[in-house]
């Protein structure tokens, strides 16, 4: 049984609800991402921060949740050390997000993430709100125009950091950004609980079958 689209990706379904309307939200302004973002390139080969990656549906997850072994290898020493509140754009195409995914790190203080990600910080904007905006249809349409030759052999879209930060985003006042980010966080929690309740009967059937 397939999940409802809202269960799979609430931001994609509801993101347009918050799109600025000039007639009733005059405080929203249009800015280039490069005007508000500062690139993050720090790394620390000696760090013991968790090794994480970005998935289109769940944002940051520990690499061990996806793979049974550490597949970073020698490249681990080049991994970017991202700090809580900073953002990373995974420009790998996926079925859910054909033009990549951007998320803010919020679950841990620091994380080591693949050096191929485009990483940045923002000082005067809410990073969680910004990730919602950057994963929305407005930015996706801009990225579609940037991608001229499809995916490279490594599966990454040919979008450089300098090109990514040329996209424009719509920004309300900081207080409204905070409210929207909080709303979506609460929504994600409710959806997770909803999915958990639906999977309980399935897990119970599996348990009974296993003990037969």
Q: Across the structure, where does each feature detected by a protein language model lie?
A:
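Feature detects amphipathic, helix-rich regulatory segments
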Residues: 1-212
């Amino acid at each position: 049984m397939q999940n409802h689209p809202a269960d799979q990706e609430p931001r994609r379904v509801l993101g347009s609800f918050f799109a600025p309307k000039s007639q009733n939200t005059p405080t929203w302004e249009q800015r280039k991402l490069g005007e508000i973002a500062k690139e993050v390139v720090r790394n620390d080969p000696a760090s013991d921060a968790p090794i994480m990656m970005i998935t289109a549906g769940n944002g940051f997850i520990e690499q061990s949740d996806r793979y049974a072994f550490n597949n970073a290898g020698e490249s681990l020493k080049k991994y970017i050390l991202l700090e809580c509140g900073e953002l990373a754009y995974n420009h790998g195409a996926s079925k859910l997000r054909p033009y990549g995914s951007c998320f803010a790190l919020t679950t841990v203080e620091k994380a080591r993430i693949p050096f191929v990600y485009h990483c940045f910080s923002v000082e005067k904007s809410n990073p969680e709100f910004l990730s919602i905006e950057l994963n929305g249809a407005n930015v996706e349409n801009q990225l579609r125009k940037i991608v001229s030759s499809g995916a490279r052999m490594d599966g990454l879209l040919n979008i450089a950091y300098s090109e990514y930060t040329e996209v424009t985003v719509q920004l309300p006042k900081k207080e409204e950004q905070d409210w929207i980010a909080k709303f979506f966080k609460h929504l994600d929690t409710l959806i997770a609980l909803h999915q958990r309740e639906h999977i309980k009967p399935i897990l119970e059937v599996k348990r009974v079958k296993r003990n037969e």
